[in-house]
Amino acid sequence: MKFYKYISYILHPVLTPIVSTLLYFIIIPNHIPEEFAYRVLSIVFVTTYIIPILLLYFLKKVKLIESYHLSSIDERKFPILFFAILSLLLGNLLLKANIINLLALSFFGITLASGIVYILFFGKIKTSLHTLGIGGLIGFIGIISYQYQLNLLLLLIFLFLLFGFIATSRLKLEAHSMNEIFIGFFVGFFTQIIVYVSYTF
């Protein structure tokens, strides 16, 4: 059981945006100034990792959440809404740079995904954020592959294997049902595609 807990921690969804950003700068053939890339990585790290962690620490301190796992739907509502707003603001900021539009769109995809997750709360559906994160990452890498005509098959296969590990760990830990696992994946994946298609075509 400890193995599955380690998988859940190592592949935590809060890390997805910084991993996506890092892979974007590594993969794309366009020349991006190194200093600019580091600046963007720093902004993404602070906005999507440091700030959410500080928020969770505050919410736990004032006893609005019982644990950092956000086990109940009620505990998830405000953090998800907050993260959606952060992602929207970050997407707008990156879009203004005008040379990393694809990366900016990925954050609009995260905003849309977070919004859908929030709406599903009203149907008492606790979407798996772990599989939402990996689904979004797979969608984003697929978009990069299409946009730049790159063969990223091996990376995509690796990410699908990670999805398998994540899904198995969440099921073994009884954190989610099978439906919640796949809802998370499809919401994460298709929101990236929807935002890209809406902006591009």
Task: Give short role names for the model-derived ranges.
Residues 7-28:
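The first (N-terminal) embedded transmembrane alpha-helix
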